[in-house]
């Protein structure tokens, strides 16, 4: 008999399971293109439809989780490309695709072009961190490249007005989607770069489908951002949207509003830093004044009797006073210049800065006067102490008619009983000195005095 009658017999369920295994193991990773027909959306959120072309069709099921990722709902007649698990529904033996991903027909070629351009730019170093330009801390002007009708423009302008209303904004209008929009976006970026009116440039638009954002993946836009001499912040779409413009820009912001926050200084933070600078200036000036006062007190306590030491101390105090005055003036000028620079940077808040400026002027006026008064007082005190020392000095006593008598060894003679006849003496007067000899002997003669 034929082998046909002796071959293994499969049940229907075994056949379907075998076919399912073959399909799932050998047809993975395929994209299938076709037109949506017989579309049904269940209350559960699942999609059931057929994908057809001119000669055949296949049943498809797309469950709620995958359907939630669609940029927009499916509709009858859509030309799409799907990827998923190709299998057999064993219960009914029906061939079907369980869809995991959907894209509009033709996006496959776009993604291929996207990956090619991305790889090329990567190889050229367009994404390298070292070519990124830093953002200015306090821009004098901010540029925006977007559509005048875009909600993103309103969001950016509102944020800039709230955070830094004193900074002017220039808009370089351009369509941000549609045929030819990539060329117009690129031209707007080139215009901003050539005019050099702004310190930083925001390139932005609101969220949308991948097709809506595709202009920012086109090479003209990417090359324009790469060549721009002004730092560029990209704020395209939502936080989960990534375009080639994001990779080549100097900074990527998650949203247009985020881009506005990145480029604008915070007004409250600036005012806080100004208040801190004023406090530090006051503390430094007070500390220098106290240090100078203590040093003058210490110098006054170091004054000793010799006239030469007094003269040296006078000269030292004068020099220290000049140095201290010069140092304080220099520091005051430096802090004043810094304060004026910060005042100019915050001209929008001139009333508050004016109060601070008046305080600085008051301190500039009061401090030299106080220092001069203190220095005058110290000089008067020094003069009085010098006069007191002068009054009790030996020279002054001699001028009153006294004299100093010393023996040949330089010992002062305080008692006449120690004198001996013929002893040599040295007498110092106010206006001179002389040597004498004792003519009348008293007591034992000293051998040393007879030489």
From Swiss-Prot:
The keyword Cell cycle is annotated on this UniProt entry: no
A GO BP annotation: DNA catabolic process
Cellular compartments per GO CC: cytoplasm; exodeoxyribonuclease VII complex
Catalytic reaction annotation: Exonucleolytic cleavage in either 5'- to 3'- or 3'- to 5'-direction to yield nucleoside 5'-phosphates
Domain of life: Bacteria
GO MF terms held by the record: exodeoxyribonuclease VII activity; nucleic acid binding
Main location as per UniProt: cytoplasm
Keywords: Cytoplasm, Exonuclease, Hydrolase, Nuclease
InterPro entries: Exonuc_VII_L, Exonuc_VII_lsu_C, OB-fold_nuc-bd_dom
Protein location: Cytoplasm
Enzyme class: hydrolase
EC number: 3.1.11.6
Family: Belongs to the XseA family.
Function: Bidirectionally degrades single-stranded DNA into large acid-insoluble oligonucleotides, which are then degraded further into small acid-soluble oligonucleotides.
PANTHER family attached to this UniProt entry: EXODEOXYRIBONUCLEASE 7 LARGE SUBUNIT
NCBIfam families referenced in this protein's UniProt entry, alphabetically: xseA
Subunit structure: Heterooligomer composed of large and small subunits.
Protein name: Exodeoxyribonuclease 7 large subunit
Chain's gene name: xseA
């Amino acid at each position: 008999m034929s082998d046909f009658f002796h071959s293994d017999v499969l049940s229907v369920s075994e056949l379907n399971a075998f076919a399912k295994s073959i399909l799932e193991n050998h047809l993975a990773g395929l994209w299938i293109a076709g037109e949506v027909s017989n579309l049904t959306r269940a209350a559960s959120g699942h999609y059931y439809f057929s994908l057809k072309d001119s000669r055949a069709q296949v049943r498809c099921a797309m469950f709620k989780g995958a359907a939630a990722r669609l940029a927009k709902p499916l509709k009858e007649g859509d030309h799409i490309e799907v990827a998923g698990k190709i299998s057999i529904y064993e219960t009914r033996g029906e061939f079907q695709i369980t869809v995991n991903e959907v894209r509009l027909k033709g996006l496959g070629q776009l993604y291929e072009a996207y990956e090619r351009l991305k790889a090329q730019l990567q190889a050229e170093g367009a994404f390298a961190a070292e070519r990124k330009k830093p953002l200015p801390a306090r821009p004098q002007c901010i540029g925006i490249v977007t559509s005048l009708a875009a909600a993103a423009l309103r969001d950016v302008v509102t944020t800039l007005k709230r955070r830094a209303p004193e900074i002017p904004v220039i808009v370089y209008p351009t369509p941000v989607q549609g045929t030819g929009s990539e060329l117009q976006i690129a031209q707007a970026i080139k215009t901003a770069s050539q005019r050099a009116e702004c310190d930083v440039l925001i390139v932005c638009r609101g969220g949308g489908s991948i097709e809506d954002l595709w202009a920012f993946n086109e090479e003209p836009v990417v090359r324009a951002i790469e060549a721009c001499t002004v730092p560029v912040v990209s704020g395209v779409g939502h936080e989960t949207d990534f375009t080639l413009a994001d990779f080549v820009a100097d900074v990527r912001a998650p949203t247009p509003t985020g881009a506005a926050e990145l480029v604008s200084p915070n007004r409250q933070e600036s005012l806080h830093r100004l208040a801190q600078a004023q406090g530090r200036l006051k503390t430094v000036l007070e500390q220098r004044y106290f240090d100078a006062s203590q040093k003058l007190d210490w110098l006054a306590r170091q004054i000793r009797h010799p006239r030469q030491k007094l003269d040296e101390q006078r000269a030292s105090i004068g020099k220290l006073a000049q140095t201290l005055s010069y140092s304080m003036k220099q520091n005051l000028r430096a802090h004043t210049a810094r304060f004026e620079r910060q005042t100019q940077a915050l001209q929008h808040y001139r009333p508050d800065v004016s109060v601070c400026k008046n305080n600085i002027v008051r301190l500039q006026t009061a401090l030299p006067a106080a220092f001069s008064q203190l220095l005058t007082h110290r000089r008067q005190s020094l003069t009085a102490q010098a006069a007191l020392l002068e009054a009790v000095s030996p020279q002054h006593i001699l001028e009153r008619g006294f004299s100093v008598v010393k023996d040949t060894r330089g010992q002062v003679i305080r008692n006449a009983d120690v004198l001996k006849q013929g002893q040599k003496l040295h007498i110092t007067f106010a206006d001179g000195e002389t040597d004498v000899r004792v003519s009348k002997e008293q007591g034992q003669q000293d051998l040393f005095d007879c030489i």
